Amino acid sequence: MIEVIVNDRLGKKLRVKCLSTDSVGDLKKVLAVQLGTAHGKVALHKGGVNLKDHISLDDYEVHDGTYLELYYL
């Protein structure tokens, strides 16, 4: 179990617990529930790279304590 910190750059920082084997799409669905928006309306970035939904967090080297940027589409 890892904890990922997501910053939406509007003042919200969310801490989300997930598995490193979860896909980016799974993480976006959890975030969408917490934010009250549709998961298709958010994008996650790490180091300026847009994370694709079907790839696992481990493949993007997202580990415990990793910061991700959240953008609203």
Curated annotation (Swiss-Prot):
Record's keyword terms, sorted: Ubl conjugation pathway
Assigned GO CC terms: cytoplasm; nucleus
PANTHER family on file: UBIQUITIN-LIKE PROTEIN 5
One GO term (biological process): mRNA cis splicing, via spliceosome
InterPro entries xref list: Hub1/Ubl5, Ubiquitin-like_dom, Ubiquitin-like_domsf
Source organism per UniProt: Eremothecium gossypii (strain ATCC 10895 / CBS 109.51 / FGSC 9923 / NRRL Y-1056) (Yeast)
GO MF term (any one): protein tag activity
Disulfide bridge positions per record: none
PROSITE patterns: UBIQUITIN_2
Ubiquitin-like domain location: 1-73
Name assigned to this protein: Ubiquitin-like modifier HUB1
